[in-house]
UniProtKB/Swiss-Prot annotation:
CDD domains: Ribosomal_uS17 (cd00364). Disulfide bonds: none annotated. The gene is rpsQ. GO terms for molecular function: rRNA binding; structural constituent of ribosome. Gene3D superfamilies: Nucleic acid-binding proteins. It comes from Syntrophobacter fumaroxidans (strain DSM 10017 / MPOB). PANTHER family: 40S RIBOSOMAL PROTEIN S11 FAMILY MEMBER, SMALL RIBOSOMAL SUBUNIT PROTEIN US17M. Keywords: Ribonucleoprotein, Ribosomal protein, RNA-binding, rRNA-binding. Belongs to the universal ribosomal protein uS17 family. GO terms for cellular component: cytosolic small ribosomal subunit. One of the primary rRNA binding proteins, it binds specifically to the 5'-end of 16S ribosomal RNA. This is Small ribosomal subunit protein uS17. Part of the 30S ribosomal subunit.
Length: 87
């Protein structure tokens, strides 16, 4: 991968939907520790990301990077596809 541009956040997630043109919905999961019950809870966030080549399919693992606002909801860009989904 190329050198990181300073100040831009990156996330690794899974493609949840690719029904829009040049846009994918990426779900990013993280584990948090509950302070009282000492259990790990799975939390997730959904991000709309720009996919210029329409290369991503549902189930792919991708790296997304923060960018300028592209539309009302899109502020992320797909940088790299890590794993292709097995069909």
């Amino acid at each position: 991968m190329e050198e990181q541009k300073s100040g831009r956040k990156t996330r690794v997630g899974r493609v949840l939907s690719n029904k829009m043109d040049k846009t994918v919905v990426v779900v990013v999961e993280r584990l948090i520790h509950h302070p009282q019950y000492h259990k790990f809870i799975r939390r997730q966030n959904k991000f709309k990301a720009h996919d210029a080549q329409n290369a991503c399919r549902v189930g792919d693992r991708v790296i997304i990077e923060e960018s300028r606002p592209i539309s009302k909801d899109k502020r992320w860009v797909v940088v790299q596809v890590l794993d292709k989904a097995v069909i």
